[in-house]
């Protein structure tokens, strides 16, 4: 459960991300594909090369979905319901992949926002991404 401090930390950190949301999302995807090659199997139709327009476009989708989640931090299930349906019923993404992408997002944010990425902010973002992952996998059960 996200505390009020966690929510404040997440919102403040996401404000710092700002207009870089698509870039950071794409970078996190690239990190995931390089670090966890099995995740590539969900994107057989993508050009997964560095700087690929398809990875950039999907990175923006990821970033925009997280921006929506931050904006609806008190109702993540409502905000992410359609995305949960898509990933569970149509795409059938293995739930572990959300954890892998979350880790890569944390690494990406830490590399771009080092002075803002305090232990408290790190913990809050980790809890937030875990909450998002839980919602996205809730319809698998």
Swiss-Prot record:
In this UniProt entry, the residues modified to N6-acetyllysine are: 16
Q: What organism is this sequence from?
A: Pteropus vampyrus
What GO molecular function terms would the record report?
Answer: haptoglobin binding; heme binding; iron ion binding; organic acid binding; oxygen binding; oxygen carrier activity; peroxidase activity
As given in the record, the signal peptide range reads none
Expression across tissues: Red blood cells.
Indicate whether Heme appears among the record's keywords: yes
Q: What is the lineage of its organism?
A: Eukaryota, Metazoa, Chordata, Craniata, Vertebrata
Q: Name the SUPFAM superfamilies for this protein.
A: Globin-like
UniProt-recorded name of the protein:
Hemoglobin subunit alpha
Q: Which residues carry this modification: Phosphotyrosine?
A: 24
Quaternary structure (record)? Heterotetramer of two alpha chains and two beta chains.
What is the primary gene name for this protein?
Answer: HBA
> From which domain of life does this come?
Eukaryota
Q: Name one GO cellular component term.
A: blood microparticle
Q: Which residues carry this modification: Phosphoserine?
A: 3, 35, 102, 124, 131, 138
Name the PANTHER family for this protein.
Answer: HEMOGLOBIN FAMILY MEMBER, HEMOGLOBIN SUBUNIT ALPHA
Q: Which InterPro entries match?
A: Globin, Globin-like_sf, Globin/Proto, Hemoglobin_a-typ, Hemoglobin_oxygen_transport, Hemoglobin_pi
Task of the protein: Involved in oxygen transport from the lung to the various peripheral tissues.
Q: Which family does it belong to?
A: Belongs to the globin family.
N6-succinyllysine modified-residue sites: 7, 11, 16, 40
Kindly name one Pfam family recorded for this protein: Globin
């Amino acid at each position: 459960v996200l505390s009020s401090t966690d929510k404040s930390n997440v919102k403040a950190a996401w404000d710092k991300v700002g207009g870089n949301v698509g870039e950071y999302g794409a970078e996190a995807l690239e990190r995931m594909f390089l670090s966890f090659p099995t995740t590539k199997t969900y994107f057989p139709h993508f050009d997964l090369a560095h700087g690929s327009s398809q990875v950039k476009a999907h990175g923006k989708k990821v970033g925009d979905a997280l921006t929506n989640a931050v904006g609806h931090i008190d109702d993540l299930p409502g905000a992410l319901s359609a995305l949960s349906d898509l990933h569970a019923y149509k795409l059938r993404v293995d739930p572990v992949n959300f954890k892998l992408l979350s880790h890569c997002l944390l690494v990406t944010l830490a590399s771009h926002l080092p002075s803002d990425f305090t232990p408290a902010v790190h913990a809050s973002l980790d809890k937030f991404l875990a909450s998002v992952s839980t919602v996205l996998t809730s319809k698998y059960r």
